[in-house]
Amino acid sequence: MTKMDIRGAVDAAVPTNIIAAKAAEVRANKVNWQSYLQGQMISSEDCEFIQRFEMKRSPEEKQEMLQTEGSQCAKTFINLMTHISKEQTVQYILTMVDDTLQENHQRVSIFFDYAKRSKNTAWSYFLPMLNRQDLFTVHMAARIIAKLAAWGKELMEGSDLNYYFNWIKTQLASQKLRGSGVAVETGTVSSSDSSQYVQCVAGCLQLMLRVNEYRFAWVEADGVNCIMGVLSNKCGFQLQYQMIFSIWLLAFSPQMCEHLRRYNIIPVLSDILQESVKEKVTRIILAAFRNFLEKSTERETRQEYALALIQCKVLKQLENLEQQKYDDEDISEDIKFLLEKLGESVQDLSSFDEYSSELKSGRLEWSPVHKSEKFWRENAVRLNEKNYELLKILTKLLEVSDDPQVLAVAAHDVGEYVRHYPRGKRVIEQLGGKQLVMNHMHHEDQQVRYNALLAVQKLMVHNWEYLGKQLQSEQPQTAAARS
Protein backbone atom coordinates (compact mmCIF):
# COMPACT_ATOMS: atom_id res chain seq x y z
CA MET A 1 0.00 0.00 0.00
CA THR A 2 1.07 3.63 -0.45
CA LYS A 3 2.34 6.18 2.04
CA MET A 4 -1.15 7.62 2.22
CA ASP A 5 -2.34 4.28 3.49
CA ILE A 6 -0.29 4.78 6.68
CA ARG A 7 -1.52 8.33 7.11
CA GLY A 8 -5.07 7.04 6.80
CA ALA A 9 -4.53 4.65 9.69
CA VAL A 10 -3.63 7.60 11.87
CA ASP A 11 -6.54 9.69 10.60
CA ALA A 12 -9.02 6.97 11.43
CA ALA A 13 -7.74 6.44 14.97
CA VAL A 14 -7.50 10.10 16.01
CA PRO A 15 -10.64 11.35 17.79
CA THR A 16 -12.59 14.37 16.58
CA ASN A 17 -12.24 17.64 18.51
CA ILE A 18 -15.37 17.23 20.58
CA ILE A 19 -14.41 13.72 21.72
CA ALA A 20 -10.80 14.74 22.43
CA ALA A 21 -12.01 17.70 24.52
CA LYS A 22 -14.55 15.63 26.42
CA ALA A 23 -11.99 12.84 27.02
CA ALA A 24 -9.55 15.38 28.54
CA GLU A 25 -12.33 16.58 30.83
CA VAL A 26 -13.23 12.99 31.81
CA ARG A 27 -9.58 12.10 32.60
CA ALA A 28 -9.34 15.10 34.93
CA ASN A 29 -12.31 13.94 37.04
CA LYS A 30 -10.73 11.18 39.10
CA VAL A 31 -13.09 8.55 40.50
CA ASN A 32 -13.35 7.78 44.22
CA TRP A 33 -12.96 4.00 43.95
CA GLN A 34 -12.95 3.62 47.73
CA SER A 35 -16.58 4.75 47.94
CA TYR A 36 -17.59 2.07 45.40
CA LEU A 37 -15.71 -0.52 47.48
CA GLN A 38 -17.45 0.59 50.67
CA GLY A 39 -20.79 0.39 48.90
CA GLN A 40 -19.87 -3.17 47.87
CA MET A 41 -20.32 -2.28 44.18
CA ILE A 42 -16.80 -3.41 43.27
CA SER A 43 -14.42 -6.04 44.64
CA SER A 44 -11.32 -5.23 46.69
CA GLU A 45 -9.24 -6.91 43.97
CA ASP A 46 -10.58 -4.57 41.26
CA CYS A 47 -10.32 -1.54 43.53
CA GLU A 48 -6.70 -2.29 44.39
CA PHE A 49 -5.74 -2.90 40.73
CA ILE A 50 -7.37 0.21 39.27
CA GLN A 51 -5.76 2.44 41.90
CA ARG A 52 -2.31 0.99 41.14
CA PHE A 53 -2.95 1.31 37.39
CA GLU A 54 -3.88 4.99 37.73
CA MET A 55 -0.61 5.67 39.54
CA LYS A 56 1.47 4.45 36.59
CA ARG A 57 2.29 7.72 34.85
CA SER A 58 4.88 6.77 32.24
CA PRO A 59 4.11 4.52 29.23
CA GLU A 60 7.00 2.23 30.28
CA GLU A 61 5.56 1.66 33.77
CA LYS A 62 2.14 1.01 32.33
CA GLN A 63 3.51 -1.39 29.72
CA GLU A 64 5.42 -3.34 32.37
CA MET A 65 2.28 -3.68 34.49
CA LEU A 66 0.17 -4.80 31.52
CA GLN A 67 2.75 -7.40 30.51
CA THR A 68 2.62 -9.05 33.93
CA GLU A 69 -1.02 -8.37 34.81
CA GLY A 70 -2.78 -8.05 31.45
CA SER A 71 -5.47 -10.55 32.35
CA GLN A 72 -6.27 -8.72 35.60
CA CYS A 73 -6.40 -5.42 33.72
CA ALA A 74 -9.02 -6.67 31.22
CA LYS A 75 -10.98 -8.33 34.03
CA THR A 76 -11.01 -5.17 36.17
CA PHE A 77 -11.96 -2.84 33.30
CA ILE A 78 -14.85 -5.10 32.30
CA ASN A 79 -16.02 -5.70 35.89
CA LEU A 80 -16.06 -1.97 36.64
CA MET A 81 -17.81 -1.21 33.37
CA THR A 82 -20.57 -3.78 33.93
CA HIS A 83 -21.13 -3.22 37.68
CA ILE A 84 -21.17 0.58 37.79
CA SER A 85 -24.08 2.46 36.27
CA LYS A 86 -23.04 6.08 36.94
CA GLU A 87 -22.46 7.65 33.51
CA GLN A 88 -19.47 9.74 34.56
CA THR A 89 -17.63 6.67 35.88
CA VAL A 90 -18.48 4.60 32.80
CA GLN A 91 -17.08 7.43 30.65
CA TYR A 92 -13.90 7.38 32.73
CA ILE A 93 -13.43 3.61 32.34
CA LEU A 94 -14.05 3.72 28.57
CA THR A 95 -11.55 6.57 28.20
CA MET A 96 -8.94 4.51 30.11
CA VAL A 97 -9.60 1.51 27.86
CA ASP A 98 -9.34 3.65 24.71
CA ASP A 99 -6.12 5.31 25.91
CA THR A 100 -4.65 1.91 26.76
CA LEU A 101 -5.35 0.57 23.24
CA GLN A 102 -4.28 3.77 21.48
CA GLU A 103 -0.87 3.75 23.20
CA ASN A 104 -0.13 0.25 21.90
CA HIS A 105 -2.31 -1.58 19.37
CA GLN A 106 -1.08 -4.99 20.53
CA ARG A 107 -2.82 -4.49 23.86
CA VAL A 108 -6.11 -5.55 22.28
CA SER A 109 -4.87 -9.08 22.97
CA ILE A 110 -5.51 -8.75 26.74
CA PHE A 111 -9.24 -8.36 25.99
CA PHE A 112 -9.24 -11.26 23.53
CA ASP A 113 -7.47 -13.54 26.01
CA TYR A 114 -9.82 -12.59 28.84
CA ALA A 115 -12.92 -13.03 26.64
CA LYS A 116 -11.74 -16.44 25.46
CA ARG A 117 -11.50 -17.72 29.04
CA SER A 118 -15.05 -16.48 29.65
CA LYS A 119 -16.23 -18.01 26.33
CA ASN A 120 -17.14 -14.54 25.04
CA THR A 121 -15.91 -12.28 22.25
CA ALA A 122 -13.81 -9.22 23.08
CA TRP A 123 -16.42 -6.81 21.69
CA SER A 124 -19.42 -8.46 23.37
CA TYR A 125 -18.75 -6.31 26.47
CA PHE A 126 -18.89 -3.07 24.47
CA LEU A 127 -21.64 -3.66 21.86
CA PRO A 128 -24.53 -3.14 24.36
CA MET A 129 -23.14 0.33 25.10
CA LEU A 130 -24.13 1.49 21.61
CA ASN A 131 -27.70 1.66 22.95
CA ARG A 132 -26.92 4.10 25.77
CA GLN A 133 -28.19 7.68 25.75
CA ASP A 134 -24.94 9.55 26.40
CA LEU A 135 -23.25 10.37 23.08
CA PHE A 136 -19.70 10.39 24.45
CA THR A 137 -20.18 6.94 26.02
CA VAL A 138 -21.69 5.56 22.82
CA HIS A 139 -18.95 6.87 20.55
CA MET A 140 -16.11 5.84 22.85
CA ALA A 141 -17.56 2.31 22.91
CA ALA A 142 -17.82 2.42 19.09
CA ARG A 143 -14.15 3.43 18.77
CA ILE A 144 -13.04 0.66 21.13
CA ILE A 145 -15.06 -1.93 19.15
CA ALA A 146 -13.44 -0.76 15.87
CA LYS A 147 -9.95 -1.00 17.38
CA LEU A 148 -10.58 -4.48 18.78
CA ALA A 149 -12.02 -5.64 15.43
CA ALA A 150 -9.31 -4.04 13.26
CA TRP A 151 -6.23 -4.68 15.41
CA GLY A 152 -7.20 -8.00 17.02
CA LYS A 153 -6.13 -11.50 16.07
CA GLU A 154 -9.74 -12.64 15.63
CA LEU A 155 -12.27 -11.30 13.14
CA MET A 156 -15.62 -9.94 14.18
CA GLU A 157 -18.27 -12.08 12.47
CA GLY A 158 -21.94 -13.00 12.24
CA SER A 159 -24.55 -11.16 14.27
CA ASP A 160 -21.95 -9.01 16.11
CA LEU A 161 -20.55 -7.64 12.85
CA ASN A 162 -24.04 -7.15 11.37
CA TYR A 163 -25.13 -5.32 14.50
CA TYR A 164 -22.09 -3.03 14.47
CA PHE A 165 -22.29 -2.26 10.74
CA ASN A 166 -26.02 -1.56 11.03
CA TRP A 167 -25.28 0.87 13.85
CA ILE A 168 -22.67 2.65 11.68
CA LYS A 169 -25.13 2.82 8.76
CA THR A 170 -27.85 4.29 10.99
CA GLN A 171 -25.49 7.00 12.27
CA LEU A 172 -24.34 7.89 8.75
CA ALA A 173 -27.95 7.91 7.51
CA SER A 174 -28.83 10.41 10.24
CA GLN A 175 -26.14 12.68 8.78
CA LYS A 176 -27.71 12.17 5.34
CA LEU A 177 -31.09 13.27 6.70
CA ARG A 178 -29.57 16.33 8.35
CA GLY A 179 -27.92 17.24 5.06
CA SER A 180 -31.25 17.05 3.23
CA GLY A 181 -32.99 19.31 5.75
CA VAL A 182 -35.09 16.57 7.39
CA ALA A 183 -35.46 17.03 11.14
CA VAL A 184 -33.47 14.48 13.13
CA GLU A 185 -33.77 13.88 16.85
CA THR A 186 -30.45 14.91 18.39
CA GLY A 187 -31.67 16.12 21.77
CA THR A 188 -29.62 19.08 22.93
CA VAL A 189 -26.67 18.36 20.64
CA SER A 190 -25.71 21.22 18.31
CA SER A 191 -25.37 20.49 14.60
CA SER A 192 -21.62 21.20 14.83
CA ASP A 193 -21.18 18.69 17.68
CA SER A 194 -23.44 16.24 15.90
CA SER A 195 -21.35 16.38 12.70
CA GLN A 196 -18.19 15.74 14.76
CA TYR A 197 -19.77 12.66 16.31
CA VAL A 198 -20.63 11.44 12.80
CA GLN A 199 -16.98 11.99 11.80
CA CYS A 200 -16.06 9.70 14.71
CA VAL A 201 -18.42 7.04 13.27
CA ALA A 202 -16.81 7.50 9.84
CA GLY A 203 -13.41 7.05 11.52
CA CYS A 204 -14.61 3.71 12.91
CA LEU A 205 -15.62 2.66 9.39
CA GLN A 206 -12.24 3.72 7.98
CA LEU A 207 -10.52 1.57 10.58
CA MET A 208 -12.74 -1.44 9.85
CA LEU A 209 -12.33 -1.26 6.07
CA ARG A 210 -8.57 -1.62 6.37
CA VAL A 211 -9.32 -5.33 6.90
CA ASN A 212 -10.19 -7.09 3.63
CA GLU A 213 -12.83 -9.40 5.16
CA TYR A 214 -14.72 -6.43 6.59
CA ARG A 215 -14.82 -4.80 3.14
CA PHE A 216 -16.87 -7.70 1.81
CA ALA A 217 -19.15 -7.68 4.86
CA TRP A 218 -19.72 -3.92 4.51
CA VAL A 219 -20.66 -4.27 0.84
CA GLU A 220 -22.99 -7.19 1.64
CA ALA A 221 -24.66 -5.01 4.28
CA ASP A 222 -25.48 -2.49 1.49
CA GLY A 223 -22.83 -0.18 2.91
CA VAL A 224 -21.85 1.30 -0.46
CA ASN A 225 -25.33 2.78 -0.92
CA CYS A 226 -24.98 4.26 2.55
CA ILE A 227 -21.68 5.95 1.61
CA MET A 228 -23.11 7.21 -1.70
CA GLY A 229 -26.15 8.59 0.17
CA VAL A 230 -23.88 10.69 2.40
CA LEU A 231 -21.80 11.91 -0.57
CA SER A 232 -24.89 12.81 -2.61
CA ASN A 233 -26.06 15.18 0.14
CA LYS A 234 -24.39 18.28 1.42
CA CYS A 235 -21.81 17.22 3.99
CA GLY A 236 -18.70 18.92 5.34
CA PHE A 237 -15.39 18.33 3.59
CA GLN A 238 -14.02 16.19 6.46
CA LEU A 239 -16.89 13.69 6.25
CA GLN A 240 -16.66 13.86 2.45
CA TYR A 241 -12.98 12.94 2.72
CA GLN A 242 -13.72 10.05 5.12
CA MET A 243 -16.43 8.59 2.87
CA ILE A 244 -14.20 8.76 -0.22
CA PHE A 245 -11.35 7.31 1.85
CA SER A 246 -13.67 4.36 2.56
CA ILE A 247 -14.34 3.92 -1.18
CA TRP A 248 -10.57 4.06 -1.82
CA LEU A 249 -10.04 1.29 0.75
CA LEU A 250 -12.77 -0.86 -0.83
CA ALA A 251 -11.12 -0.44 -4.23
CA PHE A 252 -7.90 -2.13 -3.05
CA SER A 253 -9.64 -5.45 -3.61
CA PRO A 254 -9.95 -6.56 -7.28
CA GLN A 255 -13.24 -8.34 -6.46
CA MET A 256 -14.56 -5.15 -4.90
CA CYS A 257 -13.62 -3.15 -8.01
CA GLU A 258 -15.71 -5.62 -9.99
CA HIS A 259 -18.64 -5.27 -7.60
CA LEU A 260 -18.46 -1.46 -7.34
CA ARG A 261 -19.22 -1.15 -11.07
CA ARG A 262 -22.92 -1.34 -10.30
CA TYR A 263 -22.86 1.88 -8.26
CA ASN A 264 -22.70 5.28 -9.91
CA ILE A 265 -19.46 6.16 -8.10
CA ILE A 266 -17.45 7.88 -10.86
CA PRO A 267 -20.03 10.62 -11.68
CA VAL A 268 -20.46 11.47 -7.98
CA LEU A 269 -16.70 11.63 -7.31
CA SER A 270 -16.02 13.62 -10.50
CA ASP A 271 -18.61 16.22 -9.41
CA ILE A 272 -16.92 16.51 -6.00
CA LEU A 273 -13.49 16.78 -7.68
CA GLN A 274 -14.82 19.62 -9.84
CA GLU A 275 -15.87 21.61 -6.75
CA SER A 276 -13.12 20.53 -4.35
CA VAL A 277 -11.09 23.28 -2.68
CA LYS A 278 -9.35 20.98 -0.18
CA GLU A 279 -6.15 19.26 -1.31
CA LYS A 280 -6.81 16.20 0.88
CA VAL A 281 -10.19 15.66 -0.84
CA THR A 282 -8.62 16.04 -4.30
CA ARG A 283 -5.85 13.63 -3.29
CA ILE A 284 -8.17 10.88 -2.06
CA ILE A 285 -10.45 11.13 -5.14
CA LEU A 286 -7.47 10.77 -7.48
CA ALA A 287 -6.18 7.84 -5.39
CA ALA A 288 -9.61 6.16 -5.62
CA PHE A 289 -9.71 6.69 -9.41
CA ARG A 290 -6.23 5.18 -9.64
CA ASN A 291 -7.29 2.11 -7.64
CA PHE A 292 -10.26 1.54 -9.95
CA LEU A 293 -7.91 1.45 -12.96
CA GLU A 294 -4.95 -0.27 -11.29
CA LYS A 295 -6.47 -2.88 -8.98
CA SER A 296 -9.11 -4.23 -11.38
CA THR A 297 -7.81 -7.49 -12.82
CA GLU A 298 -10.43 -7.73 -15.60
CA ARG A 299 -9.62 -5.70 -18.70
CA GLU A 300 -13.33 -5.04 -19.29
CA THR A 301 -13.71 -3.60 -15.78
CA ARG A 302 -10.72 -1.30 -16.21
CA GLN A 303 -12.07 -0.15 -19.55
CA GLU A 304 -15.51 0.53 -18.08
CA TYR A 305 -14.04 2.70 -15.32
CA ALA A 306 -11.81 4.51 -17.82
CA LEU A 307 -14.78 5.23 -20.10
CA ALA A 308 -16.83 6.47 -17.15
CA LEU A 309 -14.00 8.87 -16.21
CA ILE A 310 -13.78 10.10 -19.81
CA GLN A 311 -17.57 10.45 -19.99
CA CYS A 312 -17.55 12.57 -16.81
CA LYS A 313 -14.94 14.87 -18.36
CA VAL A 314 -12.26 13.96 -15.81
CA LEU A 315 -9.53 14.27 -18.47
CA LYS A 316 -10.12 18.02 -18.66
CA GLN A 317 -10.05 18.28 -14.85
CA LEU A 318 -6.77 16.34 -14.74
CA GLU A 319 -5.20 18.66 -17.32
CA ASN A 320 -6.18 21.64 -15.15
CA LEU A 321 -4.90 19.97 -11.98
CA GLU A 322 -1.60 19.16 -13.70
CA GLN A 323 -0.86 22.89 -13.96
CA GLN A 324 -0.96 23.33 -10.17
CA LYS A 325 1.80 22.83 -7.60
CA TYR A 326 1.31 20.29 -4.79
CA ASP A 327 3.13 19.64 -1.52
CA ASP A 328 2.14 15.99 -1.81
CA GLU A 329 3.99 14.13 -4.58
CA ASP A 330 1.33 11.36 -4.49
CA ILE A 331 -1.06 13.79 -6.20
CA SER A 332 1.35 14.54 -9.06
CA GLU A 333 2.07 10.82 -9.53
CA ASP A 334 -1.65 9.95 -9.58
CA ILE A 335 -2.42 12.74 -12.08
CA LYS A 336 0.38 11.49 -14.36
CA PHE A 337 -0.85 7.87 -14.08
CA LEU A 338 -4.49 8.79 -14.77
CA LEU A 339 -3.65 11.04 -17.74
CA GLU A 340 -1.60 8.24 -19.29
CA LYS A 341 -4.25 5.54 -18.77
CA LEU A 342 -7.17 7.70 -19.91
CA GLY A 343 -5.14 8.87 -22.90
CA GLU A 344 -4.70 5.22 -23.95
CA SER A 345 -8.43 4.57 -23.50
CA VAL A 346 -9.39 7.56 -25.65
CA GLN A 347 -7.35 6.06 -28.52
CA ASP A 348 -9.35 2.81 -28.29
CA LEU A 349 -12.72 4.49 -27.81
CA SER A 350 -15.40 3.29 -30.23
CA SER A 351 -18.72 5.09 -30.67
CA PHE A 352 -20.46 2.18 -28.94
CA ASP A 353 -18.08 2.40 -25.95
CA GLU A 354 -18.87 6.10 -25.77
CA TYR A 355 -22.62 5.47 -25.91
CA SER A 356 -22.45 2.64 -23.35
CA SER A 357 -20.43 4.75 -20.92
CA GLU A 358 -22.75 7.75 -21.27
CA LEU A 359 -25.79 5.56 -20.67
CA LYS A 360 -24.26 3.91 -17.58
CA SER A 361 -23.40 7.31 -16.12
CA GLY A 362 -27.12 8.17 -16.27
CA ARG A 363 -26.23 11.56 -17.76
CA LEU A 364 -27.61 11.42 -21.29
CA GLU A 365 -27.02 14.44 -23.52
CA TRP A 366 -27.38 15.07 -27.24
CA SER A 367 -23.89 13.78 -28.08
CA PRO A 368 -23.39 12.95 -31.81
CA VAL A 369 -23.99 9.17 -31.48
CA HIS A 370 -27.69 9.60 -30.64
CA LYS A 371 -28.46 11.30 -33.96
CA SER A 372 -26.13 9.12 -36.06
CA GLU A 373 -28.01 6.88 -38.49
CA LYS A 374 -24.81 4.85 -39.00
CA PHE A 375 -24.43 4.30 -35.24
CA TRP A 376 -27.94 2.89 -34.83
CA ARG A 377 -27.74 0.79 -37.97
CA GLU A 378 -24.52 -0.86 -36.74
CA ASN A 379 -25.17 -0.99 -33.00
CA ALA A 380 -28.91 -1.27 -32.22
CA VAL A 381 -28.62 -5.04 -31.82
CA ARG A 382 -25.75 -4.59 -29.32
CA LEU A 383 -28.17 -3.10 -26.82
CA ASN A 384 -29.35 -6.70 -26.33
CA GLU A 385 -25.96 -7.85 -25.02
CA LYS A 386 -25.54 -9.12 -21.44
CA ASN A 387 -29.23 -9.88 -21.07
CA TYR A 388 -30.36 -6.46 -22.35
CA GLU A 389 -28.19 -4.61 -19.79
CA LEU A 390 -28.15 -1.26 -21.65
CA LEU A 391 -31.83 -1.41 -22.58
CA LYS A 392 -32.72 -2.00 -18.94
CA ILE A 393 -30.71 1.09 -17.97
CA LEU A 394 -32.46 3.07 -20.71
CA THR A 395 -35.95 2.09 -19.52
CA LYS A 396 -34.93 2.68 -15.89
CA LEU A 397 -33.92 6.25 -16.76
CA LEU A 398 -37.34 6.81 -18.32
CA GLU A 399 -38.84 5.66 -15.04
CA VAL A 400 -36.70 7.47 -12.45
CA SER A 401 -35.02 10.50 -14.03
CA ASP A 402 -36.44 13.97 -13.48
CA ASP A 403 -34.02 15.65 -15.90
CA PRO A 404 -35.91 16.69 -19.09
CA GLN A 405 -32.81 16.28 -21.28
CA VAL A 406 -32.19 12.73 -20.02
CA LEU A 407 -35.85 11.82 -20.60
CA ALA A 408 -35.89 13.32 -24.11
CA VAL A 409 -32.69 11.52 -25.18
CA ALA A 410 -33.84 8.23 -23.60
CA ALA A 411 -37.19 8.37 -25.41
CA HIS A 412 -35.39 9.16 -28.68
CA ASP A 413 -33.03 6.19 -28.19
CA VAL A 414 -35.91 3.78 -27.54
CA GLY A 415 -37.42 4.90 -30.86
CA GLU A 416 -34.14 4.42 -32.73
CA TYR A 417 -33.64 0.96 -31.19
CA VAL A 418 -37.06 -0.32 -32.34
CA ARG A 419 -36.56 1.28 -35.75
CA HIS A 420 -33.27 -0.56 -36.35
CA TYR A 421 -33.84 -3.85 -34.56
CA PRO A 422 -36.67 -5.95 -36.06
CA ARG A 423 -37.81 -7.56 -32.79
CA GLY A 424 -37.18 -4.42 -30.78
CA LYS A 425 -40.85 -3.60 -30.18
CA ARG A 426 -41.48 -6.85 -28.37
CA VAL A 427 -38.33 -6.46 -26.23
CA ILE A 428 -39.26 -2.90 -25.24
CA GLU A 429 -42.79 -3.97 -24.35
CA GLN A 430 -41.48 -6.82 -22.19
CA LEU A 431 -39.22 -4.39 -20.33
CA GLY A 432 -42.15 -2.02 -19.73
CA GLY A 433 -40.54 0.62 -21.95
CA LYS A 434 -43.58 1.24 -24.16
CA GLN A 435 -45.76 2.36 -21.26
CA LEU A 436 -42.96 4.49 -19.82
CA VAL A 437 -42.51 6.32 -23.14
CA MET A 438 -46.28 6.84 -23.44
CA ASN A 439 -46.37 8.32 -19.94
CA HIS A 440 -44.05 11.10 -21.13
CA MET A 441 -46.25 12.15 -24.07
CA HIS A 442 -47.89 14.65 -21.71
CA HIS A 443 -44.71 15.82 -19.98
CA GLU A 444 -44.46 19.53 -19.19
CA ASP A 445 -41.23 19.83 -21.19
CA GLN A 446 -41.75 20.27 -24.94
CA GLN A 447 -38.59 18.31 -25.93
CA VAL A 448 -39.65 15.35 -23.79
CA ARG A 449 -43.17 15.39 -25.27
CA TYR A 450 -41.85 15.60 -28.81
CA ASN A 451 -39.34 12.74 -28.46
CA ALA A 452 -41.83 10.57 -26.58
CA LEU A 453 -44.38 11.11 -29.37
CA LEU A 454 -41.82 10.13 -32.01
CA ALA A 455 -40.83 7.02 -30.08
CA VAL A 456 -44.47 5.94 -29.66
CA GLN A 457 -45.06 6.40 -33.39
CA LYS A 458 -42.01 4.23 -34.10
CA LEU A 459 -43.35 1.60 -31.71
CA MET A 460 -46.68 1.58 -33.56
CA VAL A 461 -45.76 2.00 -37.23
CA HIS A 462 -44.39 -0.67 -39.59
CA ASN A 463 -43.58 1.39 -42.68
CA TRP A 464 -40.51 3.38 -41.70
CA GLU A 465 -40.14 5.16 -45.05
CA TYR A 466 -43.72 6.46 -44.83
CA LEU A 467 -43.20 7.48 -41.20
CA GLY A 468 -40.01 9.35 -42.06
CA LYS A 469 -41.86 11.54 -44.61
CA GLN A 470 -44.71 12.10 -42.15
CA LEU A 471 -42.34 13.17 -39.38
CA GLN A 472 -40.50 15.59 -41.64
CA SER A 473 -43.76 17.36 -42.45
CA GLU A 474 -45.09 17.16 -38.87
CA GLN A 475 -42.07 18.27 -36.84
CA PRO A 476 -42.52 22.07 -36.99
CA GLN A 477 -46.29 21.90 -36.38
CA THR A 478 -45.87 19.40 -33.52
CA ALA A 479 -43.26 21.54 -31.84
CA ALA A 480 -45.37 24.68 -32.26
CA ALA A 481 -48.55 23.01 -31.04
CA ARG A 482 -46.86 21.60 -27.94
CA SER A 483 -44.87 24.67 -26.92
Swiss-Prot record:
Q: Which GO terms describe its molecular function?
A: proton-transporting ATPase activity, rotational mechanism
Q: Which family does it belong to?
A: Belongs to the V-ATPase H subunit family.
Asked if the keyword Isomerase belongs to this entry, the reply reads no
What keywords tag this UniProt record? Answer: Cytoplasmic vesicle, Hydrogen ion transport, Ion transport, Membrane, Phosphoprotein, Transport
Subunit text: V-ATPase is a heteromultimeric enzyme made up of two complexes: the ATP-hydrolytic V1 complex and the proton translocation V0 complex. The V1 complex consists of three catalytic AB heterodimers that form a heterohexamer, three peripheral stalks each consisting of EG heterodimers, one central rotor including subunits D and F, and the regulatory subunits C and H. The proton translocation complex V0 consists of the proton transport subunit a, a ring of proteolipid subunits c9c'', rotary subunit d, subunits e and f, and the accessory subunits ATP6AP1/Ac45 and ATP6AP2/PRR. Interacts with AP2M1.
Q: Does the keyword Ion transport apply?
A: yes
Main location (coarse class)? membrane
Q: What does this protein do?
A: Subunit of the V1 complex of vacuolar(H+)-ATPase (V-ATPase), a multisubunit enzyme composed of a peripheral complex (V1) that hydrolyzes ATP and a membrane integral complex (V0) that translocates protons. V-ATPase is responsible for acidifying and maintaining the pH of intracellular compartments and in some cell types, is targeted to the plasma membrane, where it is responsible for acidifying the extracellular environment. Subunit H is essential for V-ATPase activity, but not for the assembly of the complex.
Q: This chain belongs to which protein, by name?
A: V-type proton ATPase subunit H
Q: Which SUPFAM superfamilies match?
A: ARM repeat
Where Phosphoserine occurs along the chain? 483
